[in-house]
């Protein structure tokens, strides 16, 4: 056997080269994708609109629509989101908006939560309080999400009632000096409907 035969035998008997692992693709990991799906499911379960999902969940619109259909059995409703701050300062919704915003501030200051997680937790707290009092809900999840956005952007703020000392949602340009809430000084037509949430829950 000559040198060439020995070399050929060595090459033929050598193990096959191990293929190199492919570098991970840039972008989200599988775990991040699963987390976003869980977040979307949680929000859809609370009644979030498609526009809200698109703002908070980093999944393609097509996937969000498909997920919504799978969970709800229908296509997402169309239409614009609430865009006016006036609704939140009207008499009956104001107590509920104030309750929700109080829960949100608690979650961000003492619950170490922020962003959409703080909104989700505060909305659950709001609904739990309503179950305890038997009061009908005035805020959908989309309304609650919009309220928080208005508050964070400085379009709405909280003012303390001089009588009950509770904090209530007011327009950003409303005077807070000697403010009296709608529960302590209800409008004349207020007696024709059901009473809003107790003042103790609004602060």
UniProtKB/Swiss-Prot annotation:
Entry's Gene Ontology cellular component terms: cytoplasm
Gene Ontology molecular function: DNA binding; zinc ion binding
Pfam family, one: FlhC
List of residues binding Zn(2+): 161, 164, 181, 184
Cofactor(s) recorded in Swiss-Prot or TrEMBL: Zn(2+)
InterPro entries per UniProt: FlhC
UniProt GO BP: bacterial-type flagellum organization; positive regulation of DNA-templated transcription; regulation of bacterial-type flagellum assembly
Location relative to the cell: Cytoplasm
Keywords: Activator, Bacterial flagellum biogenesis, Cytoplasm, DNA-binding, Metal-binding, Transcription, Transcription regulation, Zinc
Cofactor note: Binds 1 zinc ion per subunit.
Entries under HAMAP family matching the protein: FhlC
NCBIfam families: PRK12722.1
Protein role: Functions in complex with FlhD as a master transcriptional regulator that regulates transcription of several flagellar and non-flagellar operons by binding to their promoter region. Activates expression of class 2 flagellar genes, including fliA, which is a flagellum-specific sigma factor that turns on the class 3 genes. Also regulates genes whose products function in a variety of physiological pathways.
Family that this chain belongs to: Belongs to the FlhC family.
Assembly and interaction partners: Heterohexamer composed of two FlhC and four FlhD subunits. Each FlhC binds a FlhD dimer, forming a heterotrimer, and a hexamer assembles by dimerization of two heterotrimers.
Protein name: Flagellar transcriptional regulator FlhC
């Amino acid at each position: 056997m000559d040198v060439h035969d020995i070399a050929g035998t060595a090459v033929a008997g050598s193990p096959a080269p191990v293929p190199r692992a492919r570098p991970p693709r840039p972008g989200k990991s599988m775990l991040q994708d699963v987390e976003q799906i869980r977040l979307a499911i949680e929000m859809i379960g609370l009644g979030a609109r498609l526009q809200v999902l698109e703002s908070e969940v980093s999944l393609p619109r097509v996937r969000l629509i498909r997920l919504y259909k799978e969970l709800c059995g229908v296509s997402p409703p169309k239409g614009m989101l609430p865009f006016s701050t006036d609704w939140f300062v009207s008499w009956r919704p104001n107590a509920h908006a104030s309750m929700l915003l109080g829960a949100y501030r608690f979650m961000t200051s003492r619950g170490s939560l922020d962003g959409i997680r703080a909104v989700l937790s505060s909305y659950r707290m709001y609904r739990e309080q309503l179950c305890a009092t038997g009061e009908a809900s005035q805020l959908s999840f989309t309304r609650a999400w919009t309220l928080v956005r208005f508050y964070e952007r400085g379009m709405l703020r909280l003012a303390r009632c001089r009588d009950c000392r509770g904090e209530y949602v007011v327009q950003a340009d409303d005077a807070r000096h000697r403010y009296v809430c709608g529960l302590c000084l209800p409008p004349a037509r207020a007696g024709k409907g059901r009473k809003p949430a107790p003042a103790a829950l609004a602060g």
